[in-house]
Amino acid sequence: MSKIVKVIGREIIDSRGNPTVEAEVHLEGGFVGMAAAPSGASTGSREALELRDGDKSRFLGKGVTKAVGAVNGPIAQAIVGKDAKDQAGIDKIMIDLDGTENKSNFGANAILAVSLANAKAAAASKGMPLYEHIAELNGTPGKFSMPVPMMNIINGGEHADNNVDIQEFMIQPVGASSVKEAIRMGSEVFHHLAKVLKGKGMNTAVGDEGGYAPNLGSNAEALAVIAEAVKAAGYELGKDITLAMDCAASEFYKDGKYVLAGEGNKAFTSEEFTHFLEDLTKQYPIVSIEDGLDESDWDGFAYQTKVLGDKIQLVGDDLFVTNTKILKEGIEKGIANSILIKFNQIGSLTETLAAIKMAKDAGYTAVISHRSGETEDATIADLAVGTAAGQIKTGSMSRSDRVAKYNQLIRIEEALGEKAPYNGRREIKGQA
């Protein structure tokens, strides 16, 4: 009953108004899975390729009809008749047929959409929720946890049109007893932050991920206004709520220096920027820093890991691009201590699960993440619970493309109850 009978690809629109690929996988017995590929703004150079048409007369060149054509053509022909429950087999067929290292033939957006739709169809045929099916694919049946959210409430960098260099300033409601309570705490801080910003005469328009995007005097001022909002919401910073940052440092790395517009165009060496971040962690309870240096600055990362790695979580995003080959090298060289997991960086569910497993086996944490270009697809919520990853990054408390994932987590927690504990601070590297 889990034989694939039909595969459909289509072009839909993401949260930035750009096209993306949606796929449907139909099985015998009428079971259907549907999924859409997300899309990033600040991307690592070694990510799997997102195939765009390049036809400037359509969607400013961002159309995905070639990728959709791959879904409806060669991919469909290759997997119709196969067993959807064999996720690794389905993914391997698509990857082998594409034949390139970075999935540039069909596009990672085509392969991923089909990979996720296939998993959803297989889960439906087994009569189980997606998170339960993912736990089985992961070799950890029945093992679940609810992730601690990293809520991006101030957006800068490539996600906003402001003068803030650091791309994301996040809160983590570590003192909550459930994901539902964590989401409530995040929502309350988010609304108090609007009041704080308005009180200072600042803009409360939101960026790509639903966080506010004000012009601030410095990067540290973003932390200061968040601290004010946490207090106004009645929470204790450092106890109830901790802070996290995504520097996306590759975006302000120029000619071997880190140039910060928000600090008066000051240029830092790798070591100086690491100490700039270290100073911030002394002023505020920052427990996680992502991409604290450029993706190619491995010597700098080794130094940063030496200085900060035993105190806080250092997450590699552009650094590792959800790629087991690169992650393996990072583990061997002692670079960072956590990986950001974005399944469109690698392009299939099977490879995503392999990256999570490799990280956990090495004592690294794995943070499941959205992209800045999203849809209503909430698969990452199921992925976080089904792999018991422990942390999720899916934006702020506004925009339906972000909130869809939080709402799915609320539903899953309700269904699983005590089978899926919310472990709070213990999930974050260096905070147990």
Curated annotation (Swiss-Prot):
Names of the cofactor(s): Mg(2+)
PROSITE patterns: ENOLASE
Keyword Zinc-finger annotated: no
Documented EC number(s): 4.2.1.11
Pathway note: Carbohydrate degradation; glycolysis; pyruvate from D-glyceraldehyde 3-phosphate: step 4/5
InterPro entries according to UniProt: Enolase, Enolase-like_C_sf, Enolase-like_N, Enolase_C, Enolase_CS, Enolase_N
Record-annotated active site: 209 (proton donor), 342 (proton acceptor)
Secreted recorded as keyword: yes
Function: Catalyzes the reversible conversion of 2-phosphoglycerate (2-PG) into phosphoenolpyruvate (PEP). It is essential for the degradation of carbohydrates via glycolysis.
Subunit relationships: Component of the RNA degradosome, a multiprotein complex involved in RNA processing and mRNA degradation.
UniProt cross-references to NCBIfam families, sorted A to Z: eno
Protein name in the entry: Enolase
Organism from which the protein derives: Cronobacter sakazakii (strain ATCC BAA-894)
Source species taxonomy: Bacteria, Pseudomonadati, Pseudomonadota, Gammaproteobacteria, Enterobacterales
Gene name per UniProt: eno
